[in-house]
């Protein structure tokens, strides 16, 4: 595990700070140890997840693989919280998709109304031209 695979220090520090009770500090060496432990745990969970995906004949790790791996490495107490997070994430993505669809519909309506405005302006211009040319003929 090279240094290029280290977790971002600022993020690790933010997580540690949020986890500590008020008034409790964490030594720099402790922060480094926590970051290294988190990195090892990520590698371990990833390897276990890969096992489940490859047994299913897939090369992509799915959430199902991660949940199975969590159970296998005896961290099933994390599973309910992660399932809630995944459900919330999916819900949020659906809402974003709906908002994008609404924006696209609004853009289409604007385009249509702009086309209608352009057509009516063109019709007005051509009717003015024809009325002015008929006046000229008189």
From Swiss-Prot:
A single GO cellular-component term on record: epsilon DNA polymerase complex
Compositionally biased region (Low complexity): 129-138
Which GO biological process annotations does it have?
DNA damage response; heterochromatin formation; leading strand elongation
Keyword Coiled coil included in the entry's annotation:
yes
One GO molecular-function annotation for this sequence? protein heterodimerization activity
User: Does Transmembrane count among this protein's keywords?
Assistant: no
Instruction: Report TM segments.
Output: none
Q: Keywords, A to Z?
A: Coiled coil, DNA-binding, Nucleus
Task: Name the domain of life this protein comes from.
Answer: Eukaryota
Q: Where in the cell is it found?
A: Nucleus
Read off the CDD domains from this record: HFD_POLE3_DPB4
Compositionally biased intervals (Basic and acidic residues): 91-126
Where does the record place the region Disordered?
Answer: 91-138
Coiled-coil region(s) at which residues? Answer: 79-119
Q: Which Pfam families match?
A: CBFD_NFYB_HMF
Kindly give the Gene3D superfamilies that the UniProt entry links to this protein. Histone, subunit A
Give the quaternary structure. Consists of three subunits: pole, pole2 and pole3.
Job description of the protein: Accessory component of the DNA polymerase epsilon complex. Participates in DNA repair and in chromosomal DNA replication. Forms a complex with CHRAC1 and binds naked DNA, which is then incorporated into chromatin, aided by the nucleosome-remodeling activity of iswi/snf2h and acf1.
Q: What is this protein called?
A: DNA polymerase epsilon subunit 3
Species assigned in the record: Dictyostelium discoideum (Social amoeba)
